[in-house]
From Swiss-Prot:
Parts of the chain that traverse the membrane: 143-163
Region (Disordered): 28-133
Keywords: Blood group antigen, Cell membrane, Glycoprotein, Membrane, Signal, Transmembrane, Transmembrane helix
GO cellular component: plasma membrane
Protein name per UniProt: Glycoprotein Xg
Originating species: Homo sapiens
Subcellular location: Cell membrane
Length: 180
């Protein structure tokens, strides 16, 4: 019975030795990268795609690849939205991107009025200010929260193993003095 198991094992080992002896395996083949890796796009909003190619039956294209941009509406006289030549939020909104949501006021009872801490528009740190929509605050939270989680879990594991080890040590000890 033993010889029947030995013969297939010997044949399998010979097959493995033959496969190993090919010498055509090289780790450098896996590391060669003929084209450089492109840097990923890190924009908040994706870049718009170029418009579609014009259709032959469309008379507006005029043979151009890109259609002409629509002219901006002329400002109406007497409109106070853009008076004085100053740049404001209305000038910035050209309709390409969706509007960003406004931060919600803090929930809770109480009336309006002024805060005792002042009304500064500083959203880049400090106490009693919202970090909603703040890229610096969100980036710090993305970095710090996993580190804090790992430290807490490590401390809990160390404490549990320490108390379990002390429980085993003290299992057979008596608190009475030894009698010789």
């Amino acid at each position: 019975m033993e010889s029947w198991w030995g013969l297939p094992c010997l044949a399998f080992l010979c097959f493995l030795m033959h496969a190993r002896g090919q010498r055509d395996f090289d780790l450098a083949d896996a590391l060669d990268d003929p084209e450089p890796t492109k840097k990923p796009n890190s924009d908040i909003y994706p870049k718009p795609k170029p418009p579609y190619y014009p259709q032959p039956e469309n008379p507006d294209s005029g043979g151009n690849i890109y259609p002409r941009p629509k002219p901006r509406p002329q400002p109406q006289p007497g409109n106070s939205g853009n008076s004085g030549g100053y740049f404001n939020d209305v000038d910035r909104d050209d309709g390409r991107y969706p509007p960003r949501p406004r931060p919600r006021p803090p929930a809770g009872g109480g009336g309006g009025g002024y805060s005792s801490y002042g009304n500064s528009d500083n959203t880049h740190g400090g106490d009693h200010h919202s970090t909603y929509g703040n890229p610096e605050g969100n980036m710090v939270a993305k970095i710090v929260s996993p580190i804090v989680s790992v430290v807490v879990v490590t401390l809990l594991g160390a404490a549990a193993s320490y108390f379990k080890l002390n429980n085993r040590r003290n299992c057979f000890r008596t608190h009475e003095p030894e009698n010789v």
